[in-house]
Design a protein with these regions (language model features):
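Surface polyanion/phosphate-binding segment centered on an Asp-His-Pro turn
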Residues: 234-253
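Conserved beta strand-loop-helix elements of the APE1-like EEP
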Residues: 64-80, 206-227
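Metal-dependent phosphoesterases centered on the DNase I-like endonuclease/exonuclease/phosphatase
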Residues: 51-54, 126-211
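Surface-exposed cleft-lining segments at the edges of enzyme active sites
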Residues: 84-86, 110-127, 163-167
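N-terminal, active-site-proximal structural segment of metallo-dependent hydrolase catalytic domains
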Residues: 1-48, 61-66, 253
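Active-site-proximal beta-strand elements of phosphoester/diester hydrolases
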Residues: 1-9, 102-114, 147
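Catalytic metal-binding/acid-base residues of hydrolase active sites
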Residues: 9, 36-37, 109-111, 151-153, ...
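Structured beta-strand-rich core segments of catalytic domains in phosphoester-bond hydrolases
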Residues: 36-113
Length: 253
């Protein structure tokens, strides 16, 4: 099974950069997009809804031009869930989940903690609730793949120039500790399972020439670690300030 994920920084903007033909040529079984900044019904191009995929969108209830997630599924899921049951966050359109018999795939956009548009205290509040949720579902007899823009990096090798800067977005002590705790408690970074030493980056918050950070990944149940066959970051084309992450798993939905 191939899972592709990307923070698009606006679906229609990314489409104007060539996203649509590229993304549907990657032979992905699941495509997770974040920060779509649109409603499903505002997308005017038919090419965004190929017959080979079932498309699902979660919009910001109050303003669809903010946040938003999407999942494209080659095989129809058993169920689709919007939100995580977090009363302060579900209306923001930051989580969408596809359930299959033994596997759940989520498309997640962690609230930004970067000023001027983000608030670190809000982000940390969301992460606190997410941690409790992930620990609760960890014991379920199913595997989880959470694709998204986490806006966090854990190790120095995941942040370019980490030794020279103290203001790297997503690289605060609190955020790194949160990820470290998650990885000790039954979850793993799918990219690092396949590429333990590869210094790749997925987000350039200050533009193409700025230092990169690997904040985009697929966080998986520990039980899936042995199923990760390969992982890559695609940088040949630019669709947004983020790069697509592609992971192949030795599993069947």
């Amino acid at each position: 099974m191939r899972v592709l994920s990307l923070v698009v920084d606006g679906y229609e903007r990314a489409a104007s950069q060539g996203l649509i033909p590229w993304v549907f040529e990657q032979n992905a079984d699941i495509i997770c997009l974040q920060n779509t900044q649109c409603s499903e019904y505002s997308i005017k191009t038919d090419a965004a809804f190929p017959e080979s995929y079932h498309a699902y969108f979660a919009d910001n209830y109050d303003n669809p031009s903010i946040n938003g997630c999407a999942i494209y599924c080659r095989d129809m899921p058993k169920a689709i869930m919007m939100g995580l049951g977090f009363i302060d966050f579900d209306h923001l359109g930051i989580y969408l989940q596809a359930d299959y018999d033994t596997c759940t795939i989520g498309s997640l956009l962690v609230p930004s903690g970067v000023a001027p548009h983000g608030d670190r205290s809000v982000k940390l509040s969301f992460l606190h609730q997410l941690d409790a949720h992930l620990q609760k579902v960890r014991n379920k007899k199913r595997d989880f793949i959470l694709c998204g823009g986490w806006e966090m990096a854990w190790r120095p090798m995941d942040a370019e120039e980490s030794g020279n800067r103290i203001d790297i977005p997503g690289f605060s002590t609190e955020e790194r500790d949160w990820l470290g705790s998650l990885y000790r408690d039954g979850y793993a970074d799918a990219f690092r399972e396949a590429e333990p030493d590869n210094e790749e980056f997925t987000w350039w918050p200050e533009g193409d020439d700025s230092p990169g950070i690997r904040t985009d990944t697929q966080i998986i149940s520990e039980s899936l670690c042995a199923s990760v066959e390969s992982a890559s970051v695609y940088t040949n084309d630019v669709f947004s300030s983020h790069a697509p992450v592609i992971v192949d798993y030795d599993i069947t939905l």
